[in-house]
Amino acid sequence: MEGKDGSIDKGLLQSTELYKYILDTSVYPREEECLKELRALTWTHPRAVMGTAPETGQFMALLLKTINAKKTLEIGVFTGYSLLLTALAIPHDGKITAIDINRDTYEIGLPIIEKAGVKHKIDFIESKALPALDHLLKDGENKESFDFVFVDADKVNYANYHERVLELLRPGGIVVYDNTLWGGTVAMAPDLVAESKLQYRNAAVEFNNFIAADSRVQISQLPVGDGITVCRRK
């Protein structure tokens, strides 16, 4: 991801130059102006690294269009970059249920979302994800009704989210989990990982093993952004 000062985080690629080539050639020229604006605004936030990588967003938009997604769910919103790109990709009468524990960060990007004319598609829920998902499941009409889910929240709970998401997702629906390679630390011995990254590194390893063994979904783990795992519910 490119910082507000022009610096480049190469992500999982071997060279900054190659990552910049991908961004400059294929990602930034296709990125809508409202997304550029929100990405730049996000980089002024102290926790900007929590934002969705633009190349991840581009791939998600492609998936959304490919499956003709209309009803989607987002777990973890932050400033709303992925939320905005989803709203732009789904039809005018499409709906997104967006869950985040912090409304303040969502409101950072809200003026840009409103300016883009897509706020009417969003139902924002300020809550921890697990109780919000359990509440959704109490309504039988929500079960197997979502076309697409994006998960970018507390990594320790990914397996717990997954069980609930599978109840909400229609057969053939797609769920994308972000940060499943955690800066490449999943391939490192634990004693070589910085203490600040170890908890989520361990959580990612555990989730990766869990999802690899889940016969209910087809999966593909990709070195896009900080690593994403794409699952299709059978």
UniProtKB/Swiss-Prot annotation:
GO BP: any one term: lignin biosynthetic process
Superkingdom per UniProt: Eukaryota
GO MF annotation terms: caffeoyl-CoA O-methyltransferase activity; metal ion binding
Top-level EC class as recorded in UniProt: transferase
Pathway(s) served: Flavonoid metabolism
Binding sites annotated in the UniProt record for S-adenosyl-L-methionine: T52, E74, G76, V77, S82, D100, A129, D154
Pfam families noted in UniProt: Methyltransf_3
Keywords, in A-Z order: Lignin biosynthesis, Metal-binding, Methyltransferase, S-adenosyl-L-methionine, Transferase
Cofactor(s) this protein requires: a divalent metal cation
Binding site for a divalent metal cation: D152, D178, N179
PROSITE patterns named in the record: SAM_OMT_I
Family per similarity comment: Belongs to the class I-like SAM-binding methyltransferase superfamily. Cation-dependent O-methyltransferase family.
Function noted in UniProt: Cation-dependent phenylpropanoid and flavonoid 8-O-methyltransferase involved in the biosynthesis of polymethoxylated flavonoids natural products such as nevadensin and salvigenin, aroma compounds which contribute to the flavor of sweet basil, and exhibit pharmacological activities such as anti-allergic, anti-oxidant, antibacterial, anti-proliferative, and anti-inflammatory effects. May also act as a flavone 3'-O-methyltransferase. Catalyzes S-adenosylmethionine-dependent regioselective 8-O-methylation of flavonoids; mediates likely the conversion of pilosin (PIL) to nevadensin (NEV).
Protein name: Cation-dependent phenylpropanoid and flavonoid 8-O-methyltransferase 1
Gene: PFOMT-1
